Amino acid sequence: LELLSLQSTSDQTDYLHNSHIAANVASAVTPEQAGMWVYPYEDNEEHVIYNMVNGLLLRPYISGMVWKMSDTGMKRMQEGIALYKEIRSDVRDGVPFFPLGFGHIRDEALAYGIINGDVAYLAVFTPAADEVKIPLTFEKEIVEVSVIYPKEQLCEYSYENGVLHVKMPQKAAARLFRI
């Protein structure tokens, strides 16, 4: 990594398993060098969103047959890449945090974040659940929590007493939050 700016994190082709890698890899490789394959291979909106969230707090590599995507799928990918361009300096300069601890392959929910000064980003994955409670503890009071990917939140969430409660529209869903 001293000589090259990118390191592929895996050749894993199952996007659900990739989230387990995405939620842990910043413990071994700096997030901005951790290349995460983002390869929607189903033309399903939640599938595209999940794949994009896998890479947004790392270094997304776009792959797959994106020319076969529907307009909706392509717009979701474009939205994700545009967001990555907005937040990549925070990803580069931030410090990783793991509010649920390191994820294990059988975990029903995973969470991985980056904090940089007054802003934090949190990727929430529910590979085998549709709901998760995530304890959040920061030095400063949390004033606002919002879904930033996708722009239309497409999930329910609330933050009370140091816990972010997220209810996804289905199992195998993911969202990116700004805190």
What are these regions (language model features)?
Residues 1-68:
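Glycan-recognition surfaces
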Residues 111-114, 153-159:
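Short, exposed beta-strand/loop patches in secreted or surface proteins that constitute
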Residues 40, 133-135, 157:
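Short conserved micro-motifs at the rims of enzyme active sites and ligand-binding pockets
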Residues 137-152:
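Solvent-exposed beta-hairpin/edge-strand motifs
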Residues 102-141, 172-178:
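Carbohydrate-binding surface patches
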Residues 156-179:
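C-terminal beta-strand-rich structural cap/linker in extracellular carbohydrate-active enzymes
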Residues 54-100:
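Aromatic- and carboxylate-lined catalytic core of secreted/periplasmic carbohydrate-active enzymes
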Residues 58, 125-127, 148:
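Structured loops at beta-to-helix junctions and adjacent beta-edge loops in soluble globular domains
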